[in-house]
Amino acid sequence: MTQTSVDARPAPIDPRGPRFAASVTALLLLVGTFFALTGAATRTGTTLGERLADPGFWVLLIVDLLFVWGFTSPRTAPWGVLFRSLIRPRLAPPADLEDPRPPRFAQIVGFTVVTVGLVLHVAGVPWALPVAGAAAFVAAFLNAAFAFCLGCQLYLGLARVGVIRPRGGLAAT
């Protein structure tokens, strides 16, 4: 009989999964930021209708909803399912596994950044949408291209100073 504890660490994950998700997310963020730069998001005096009709708003709203899906149900999030079903079976086993909590926190950070941009855009703040999209793109690109997860580093830093108290503690790094 196995005993489970609420203080146990969650099962580790293949670190290539979040990197794959970051790659797709970076591409979507780049497209959304491009559309935001060419739409109503950079102009002053736009109407609410013009701001809501901005294609960049819709692309970044979809990305934001994907962030929510990613941190509320990572097992069913589309990029994770795609990675596990189509990509991971074709790869060698990972050299190391990682704690899933930092990548999940990174999804929350991405959601927060893009949500602030969306809300400010709807409120009529020029440049809020492309700036938020670009900031989220930089973070996703760093993860996808260089395996540097900015949100994960933020999580680890906050855990080390005690702002976040992960159940089961942190794995040794």
PLM regions and their residue ranges:
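Membrane-interfacial helix-loop segments of redox and metal-homeostasis proteins
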Residues: M1-T173
